[in-house]
Amino acid sequence: MKIEDIVQKEVKDISCYEVKTILEQKSQEKIAKMNLNENFAIPNDTIQKILVDTCRSIDVRAYPPPRGSLACKAISSFLGFSESEVSVANGADEIMDLLMKVFVRKGSKVITVEPSFPMYTFFTQLYGGSTVPVLLRPDFSLDVDAVLEKADKNTKLLFVCSPNNPTGNQFRESDIKRLLQEFNGVVVVDEAYVDFAQGSVINWVRDYDNLAVLRSFSKAFGLAGLRLGYLVSSTSVVDYIQRVVGPFNVNSVTQQTIALALEKWSYFKEQIKYVVNEREWLMKNLQQIDGVTPYPSDTNFILFKVTKSDLTSAIVTERMEARDVLVKDRGHLTLLENCIRVTVGNRNMNEKFVSALKESLEE
């Protein structure tokens, strides 16, 4: 018997999602890690203190509260929703996986607006569905008519990342509202970056049964390593999600830390303001550098285009890495030729990035 003979076709057809890691021979302190939109603007000491309080209050010999119920209770109370309208999981990625388990099978279709987060397509293909990509307009706005034209009776889900990764812009509420009213399926609005933007559609959950809002603690709270994502939706959607989730899917440390972090919201809100201010500082500096053009951002990252004629985004990204600054080359994506995404860091990181970028453009 060959193992590949009994492996599902959908698994054979996908490849492992690659993530750039820091070279072991270089210390993390030396590297400006600005490629994965993690929040290093929050001092690590602050996070460590919360973790210490967590470890003093839990017993990891016991199984965690089932289905993330401790975190679910804290989140629902914080947002003003009932616990029956919230589902939590190991990162937003697992929420996507759970949505696919509920809604997608072979023959199902999932619409994505591109360019956007690639994991929507990854999970769709894993469950035998097909992704129907719809391009954003040249100004990165939603083409609602094009989305609705692509939908048919087999279309189960529509993913809209707002603010969008990697373009950085938040979509118009009027466009999202029209999709909710006219799309005959579940509209998943990924608000992982919403804390850095001006508005949210999360309260629309009370008005639209087909709205599911996806959020994360990785960005605004700087807790990417703990892996906690959550979904706010109608009780019917959440009920189906709960049916397919494992009983102990979120560990005790993560759940308790999330509860404690939410109690310190005023602190994290100030850190969000700091990131937004640093984003504006970074934007102004990028606008003053010949050879690049930055795009407006409602997130904790900025997308910019390499416009110097003899360079590509891949070359600049490689040169930046040689200077111990990691950024994300997005130049291979549709509409984003020669574009690079950089995470907003603390001032030291941002200054190092600006210096490395200038050198990389002139090398």
Give the residues covered by each predicted segment.
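Phosphate-binding glycine-rich loop
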Residues: 69-109
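Conserved PLP-binding catalytic core of the aspartate aminotransferase-like
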Residues: 276, 289-323, 340
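PLP-dependent aminotransferase-like
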Residues: 102-160
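Active-site phosphate-binding strand-loop segment of PLP-dependent enzymes
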Residues: 138-195
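PLP-dependent enzyme catalytic core of the Aspartate aminotransferase-like
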Residues: 309, 322-323, 332-363
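PLP-dependent aminotransferase class I/II
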Residues: 44, 67, 210-288, 293-295
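N-terminal "arm"/small-domain region of PLP-dependent enzymes with the aminotransferase-like
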Residues: 1-62
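Short acidic capping loops at alpha-helix termini that bridge into adjacent secondary structure
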Residues: 82-86, 106-109, 154, 191, ...
